[in-house]
Amino acid sequence: MNRNTPLTAHPLHGVRHRVWSAQQLRAEGVSAAQAASQCLPGGPWQQLLPGVFLLHPGPPTDQERVHGALLYAGRPPASARRAGPAPAGPEYGEAMVTGLAALALYGFEAAPPVVALHRVDVLVPRTRRLRSTRFVQVVRAAVPPRPQTRLGMPLAPVERALADAVASLTDAPTVRRLLTEAVRAGYCEPAAVVRELSAAKLLGRAHVVDAVEELLAEGRAVAEDRLYEMVRRHGLPEPLWNVDLCLPGGACLGAVDAYWPEQALAVEIGAPAPREGGTADREHLERLGVTVVRVTPGRLREAMAQQAVVVRTAMAAAEDREPAAYVVVLPR
């Protein structure tokens, strides 16, 4: 092989086969010296990253940059590379794309396209001895999350990718747009985003706190829209929306998102864990004969039909109960 001879021993198909690691080339019979000779000025290849080669002379596409970043970050440790040929298994190891690059690959409109990013963030286990280089920014995790796959590439879950993106952003409008889109487009739930931002110690930043307030408001609005959709799509009777339930003397027992007076049935949108003070209100209402069904935003998004069955079943059960105590229903 001379320096102008491209790799043609095996058919090359798709973006993956235009970006190869040194270990993959070695498994195909291409030595380190031969690979280096292909990258001399005027040669057909170029070294994209340490140990990663681009098998054409032009600029890399956005997918080639991401694939190269994953090959660099996912390569085995040096000791394993010296031990022998590439082992069978995932070519990226435990590496996954995170940050703005991951959000762009998920399809976020608020994230710049990968080609416009000056770096690609790649998440790896904390134990990996790996340095950031060129356009690759190494991000570490004590316990890496389970990746999602898009375009054949492992991506950090949206909430983790958001936290890693926000960590490097100081532009408040961009942070707000990213967080809002995550919820509005149904990528993840607000609680999951807040958990990741808290774990990354980002909730002390003023512009992040402001964005989280908008995120929670957006999440609430989206969940309410889904509750309206559930009632109408599944033919449930129209309830009273967004009301306070009070005793005749004026003491308020709690706010609910939907209430069917004839069945004394209330539906409340809530987080998986009841909010502070919510349990006491619910218990008081149930002692008065009011059934309270709690639905989470996630269940409304992922299992709307099942939640409709729960509500319909509660309505049917109301026919066998003693009449509820009189409560006053007030607009919230």
Which role fits each region the language model picked out?
Residues 1-204, 240, 316-332:
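Short gly/ser-rich loop at a beta-strand->alpha-helix junction or flexible surface loop bordering the NTP-binding
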Residues 2-4, 30, 183-332:
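Surface segments flanking catalytic/ligand-binding clefts of nucleic-acid enzymes
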